[in-house]
């Protein structure tokens, strides 16, 4: 399968501070990659590298020519005194036609919000509107920066269900950034745990294997949420230095 974006041994420094070190990944059509990591781990920098907004100091980046990217930001800041409906907000995107708006909203099951004030939307509704905005670009790559932030568990399940549906319909690659170090979308194809470098990677463990989780969130939640178990051979000290775990040597 041809990758839309591939990074090979990419490193980024800001001044004397190394933010990313030897990071490699591939984003392929129809595949979901979830990026996990603590605050300050370099997740936002890595997203900017993928988007072409930050050039690496070392390593190789390959992108499909004329790649169309849809981006959903982590937060949306709006002036609460500014009268702005969902319709007007979406039309602010350059190149958007009036006739594109309602179909995009309907695609994310948010057609009923077209005349709603942006400031009155719930967290889940806001994420759907931002997702509709990203779809206006007919993306080959969908980048979602912490899409479930501020959304309750039921909203997360519905959002993950929608993301899975969209990646199948569009056959697009999905890069999802998560602040939750353990709970991820079950249908993620690969999880990368980042702390300036890739600490570990693998597939999420499907939540259906955890009866106590199903009893808490129901069978539908079990289908859409997964637990990722980290397998690190090291830890990071307070200065960010790598310390190998016992049995793996010392540093």
Swiss-Prot record:
<keyword id="KW-0067">ATP-binding</keyword>
<comment type="similarity">
    <text>Belongs to the ABC transporter superfamily. Zinc importer (TC 3.A.1.15.5) family.</text>
</comment>
<feature type="binding site">
    <location>
        <begin position="37"/>
        <end position="44"/>
    </location>
    <ligand>
        <name>ATP</name>
    </ligand>
</feature>
<keyword id="KW-0406">Ion transport</keyword>
<keyword id="KW-1003">Cell membrane</keyword>
<comment type="subunit">
    <text>The complex is composed of two ATP-binding proteins (ZnuC), two transmembrane proteins (ZnuB) and a solute-binding protein (ZnuA).</text>
</comment>
<keyword id="KW-0813">Transport</keyword>
<dbReference type="GO" id="GO:0016887">
    <property type="term" value="F:ATP hydrolysis activity"/>
</dbReference>
<dbReference type="GO" id="GO:0005524">
    <property type="term" value="F:ATP binding"/>
</dbReference>
<keyword id="KW-0472">Membrane</keyword>
<feature type="domain" description="ABC transporter">
    <location>
        <begin position="5"/>
        <end position="220"/>
    </location>
</feature>
<keyword id="KW-0862">Zinc</keyword>
<dbReference type="GO" id="GO:0005886">
    <property type="term" value="C:plasma membrane"/>
</dbReference>
<dbReference type="InterPro" id="IPR050153">
    <property type="entry name" value="Metal_Ion_Import_ABC"/>
</dbReference>
<comment type="function">
    <text>Part of the ABC transporter complex ZnuABC involved in zinc import. Responsible for energy coupling to the transport system.</text>
</comment>
<dbReference type="Pfam" id="PF00005">
    <property type="entry name" value="ABC_tran"/>
</dbReference>
<keyword id="KW-0547">Nucleotide-binding</keyword>
<keyword id="KW-0864">Zinc transport</keyword>
<protein>
    <recommendedName>
        <fullName>Zinc import ATP-binding protein ZnuC</fullName>
        <ecNumber>7.2.2.20</ecNumber>
    </recommendedName>
</protein>
<dbReference type="InterPro" id="IPR003439">
    <property type="entry name" value="ABC_transporter-like_ATP-bd"/>
</dbReference>
<keyword id="KW-1278">Translocase</keyword>
<dbReference type="GO" id="GO:0010043">
    <property type="term" value="P:response to zinc ion"/>
</dbReference>
<keyword id="KW-0997">Cell inner membrane</keyword>
<dbReference type="InterPro" id="IPR003593">
    <property type="entry name" value="AAA+_ATPase"/>
</dbReference>
<dbReference type="GO" id="GO:0015633">
    <property type="term" value="F:ABC-type zinc transporter activity"/>
</dbReference>
<dbReference type="InterPro" id="IPR027417">
    <property type="entry name" value="P-loop_NTPase"/>
</dbReference>
């Amino acid at each position: 399968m041809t990758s839309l974006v591939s990074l090979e041994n990419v490193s980024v420094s800001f001044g004397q501070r190394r933010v990313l070190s030897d990071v490699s990944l591939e984003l392929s059509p129809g595949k979901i990659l979830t990026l996990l990591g603590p605050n300050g781990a370099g997740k936002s920098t890595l997203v900017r590298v993928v988007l072409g907004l930050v050039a690496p100091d070392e390593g190789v980046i390959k992108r499909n020519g004329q790649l169309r990217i849809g981006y959903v930001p982590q937060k949306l800041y709006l002036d609460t005194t500014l009268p702005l409906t969902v319709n007007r907000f979406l039309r602010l995107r350059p190149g958007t036609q009036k006739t594109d708006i309602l179909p995009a909203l309907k695609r994310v099951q948010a057609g009923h919000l077209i005349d709603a004030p942006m400031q009155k939307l719930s967290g889940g509704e806001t994420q759907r509107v931002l997702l509709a905005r990203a779809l206006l670009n007919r993306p080959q790559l969908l980048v979602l920066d912490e899409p479930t932030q501020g959304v309750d568990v039921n909203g997360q399940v519905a959002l993950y269900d929608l993301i899975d549906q969209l990646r199948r319909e569009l056959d697009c690659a999905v890069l999802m950034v998560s602040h939750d170090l353990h709970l991820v979308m079950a249908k993620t194809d690969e999880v990368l745990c980042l702390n300036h470098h890739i600490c570990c990677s693998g597939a999420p463990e499907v939540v259906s294997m955890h009866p106590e989780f199903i009893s808490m969130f129901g069978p539908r939640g079990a289908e859409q949420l997964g637990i990722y178990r980290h397998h690190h051979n090291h830890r990071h000290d307070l200065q960010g230095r790598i310390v190998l775990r016992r049995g793996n040597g010392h540093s």
